[in-house]
């Protein structure tokens, strides 16, 4: 079957790159889900030209099931529905060269290798923004904007909710 997906060279101007945290929040019940889901929905419909690395979906499954206590079947169903859209926003490539560049950025900025990969993608596609909930990344990277697309008041509610959820029972 021939897919009608856009090849990276045909994408044109890319607004931004989407980090794993946004994907996570959009795929399980929480106070910020509606906002994260709405944001991803626009991207998957290609109304906003942002790229979501497919590897972010894999990372989201790990975070959801291992750290947030989301049932594995629920995480699987939610994330596979997103992948099954086969949206041109889903970026599939991790080459050896991209991994090398990602590690170089990680070393240079003293950040995680994943964040180095996001910087690599932003530079590769000349995207001026990384959409992320990682405020530490925003402090360290100056030439690319790091923006949380979830409104601050909603994100504050999410953080409070997540702290309570992850707090051990006395």
Task: Describe each PLM feature range.
Residues 25-27, 63, 140:
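Residues that scaffold the ATP/ADP-binding catalytic core of kinase and kinase-like folds
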Residues 130, 146-153:
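Short hydrophobic/aromatic-enriched beta-strand-loop microsegments
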Residues 137-144:
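Short loop/helix-cap segments at secondary-structure boundaries that form the rim of catalytic
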Residues 37-51, 55-108, 120, 158, ...:
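PIN-domain endoribonuclease scaffold, especially VapC-family toxins
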Residues 21, 54, 96, 134-135:
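Alpha-helix N-cap/helix-start capping motif
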Residues 20, 112-129, 136:
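Acidic, metal-associated active-site segment
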Residues 136-137, 150-159:
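Short, acidic/turn-prone active-site loops that include or flank metal/cofactor-
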């Amino acid at each position: 079957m021939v897919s009608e997906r856009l090849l990276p060279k045909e994408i044109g101007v890319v607004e931004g790159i989407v980090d794993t945290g946004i994907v996570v929040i959009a795929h399980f019940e929480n106070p910020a889900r509606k906002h994260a889901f709405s944001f991803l929905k626009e991207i998957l419909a290609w109304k906003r030209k942002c790229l979501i690395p497919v590897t972010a979906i894999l990372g989201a499954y790990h975070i959801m099931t291992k750290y947030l206590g989301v049932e594995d079947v629920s995480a699987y169903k939610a994330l596979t529905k997103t992948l099954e859209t086969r949206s041109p926003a889903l970026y599939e490539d991790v080459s050896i060269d991209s991994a090398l560049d990602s590690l170089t950025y990680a070393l240079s900025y003293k950040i995680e290798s994943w964040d180095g990969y996001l910087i690599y993608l932003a530079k590769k596609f000349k995207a001026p923004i990384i959409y992320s909930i990682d405020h530490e990344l925003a402090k360290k990277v100056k030439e690319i904007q790091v923006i949380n697309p979830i409104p601050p008041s909603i994100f504050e509610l999410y953080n409070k909710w997540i702290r309570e959820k992850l707090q051990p029972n006395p």
